[in-house]
Swiss-Prot record:
Consequence of changing H74Q: Impaired acrosome reaction
Protein's recorded name: Group 10 secretory phospholipase A2
SMART domains from the UniProt entry: PA2c (SM00085)
GO cellular component: acrosomal vesicle; extracellular space; lysosome
């Protein structure tokens, strides 16, 4: 059963074929974040649903590894976008996936541009990391209360 769970988490993203990853135009919701992660790869977006102290909903404490730092910086990026009047989890933006590369735009407003850049940075950041199973389903109680400050 654990092996099946790991294959689902670390295998190809659900609902995204190789052709979809190569060339497709998306509109955003939270599912679009998953699309950008799947476009760049190498793991399923599900692999980050509950990882470390920052990947998934919420976040606090000291990031545990490079993946967790990517998610922390993404949270900071979403906070900056929210401060600029955007709704990161609801606002939509146009983008394309071309040969595993994210192409943002054409943006109709600043929020679309900001949010696509946040998701793009996360996707490329995660692509260069090593995955540590010990941080999958990491108990949030083990994350400290104090968080690093966003830049």
């Amino acid at each position: 059963m654990l092996l099946l769970l790991l294959l689902l988490l670390l295998g190809p993203g659900p609902g995204f074929s190789e052709a979809t990853r190569r060339s497709h135009v998306y509109k955003r919701g939270l599912l679009e974040l998953a699309g950008t992660l799947d476009c760049v790869g190498p793991r399923s977006p599900m692999a980050y649903m509950n990882y470390g102290c920052y990947c998934g909903l919420g976040g606090h404490g000291e990031p545990r590894d490079a993946i967790d730092w990517c998610c922390y910086h993404h949270d900071c990026c979403y906070s900056r976008a929210q401060d600029a009047g955007c709704s990161p989890k609801l606002d939509r933006y146009p983008w394309k996936c071309m040969d595993h590369h994210i192409l943002c735009g054409p943006a109709e407003n600043k929020c679309q541009e900001l949010l696509c850049r946040c998701d793009e940075e996360l996707a490329y950041c995660l692509a260069g990391t090593e995955y540590h199973l010990k941080y999958l389903f990491f108990p949030s109680i083990l994350c400290e209360k104090d968080s690093p400050k966003c830049n």
